[in-house]
Amino acid sequence: MQDVLNHLSRQLRSFTLALCLGLTLLLTACGDSVSMLTGDYVEDTVAVVHTLQTTLALPADAEGLQDSEREAHDLINDYMSRYRPQPRVNGLSSFTTMQTALNSLQGHYNTYTNRPVPDDLRARVDKELGKAEKAVLRGT
């Protein structure tokens, strides 16, 4: 009798644990991620440019650099997934310039996760971000 109760107790604990883990995964996967994007292309582009320029300006030994780079990585994903499929936006010169800068930076973050952004890449991306910001403010 005791063996049967122990077996049932073990099964109940396993089932409860599996249920809790499943619900946790379901709720976190379906939750709306907090994003700084507003849906306004001009505002979002300027905000992303400023955020990325701030992240790029951090020294290699800055406290919180990895967190900033991780947030930049997520921001790039959010921005591109929002605006790449929109034909009214992705034909603009500001978007293509922005896309070039973001692809370069994202490529570095994906390939060299724990390494600082090289100076030449930093300068090129910063220049392209500046061009994209000027173009979007002009309306092109």
At which residue positions do the language-model features occur?
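Short, charged, amphipathic alpha-helical segments
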Residues: 66-73, 92-100, 119-130
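Bacterial N-terminal signal peptides that target proteins for export
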Residues: 3-19
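Alpha-helical segments in soluble extracytoplasmic regions
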Residues: 37-91
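Long, amphipathic, charge-rich alpha-helical segments that form helical bundles/coiled-coils
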Residues: 82-116
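C-terminal motif of bacterial Sec signal peptides marking the signal peptidase cleavage site
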Residues: 26-29
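Bacterial signal peptide processing site
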Residues: 31-34
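C-terminal amphipathic alpha-helix
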Residues: 49-51, 55-58, 110-140
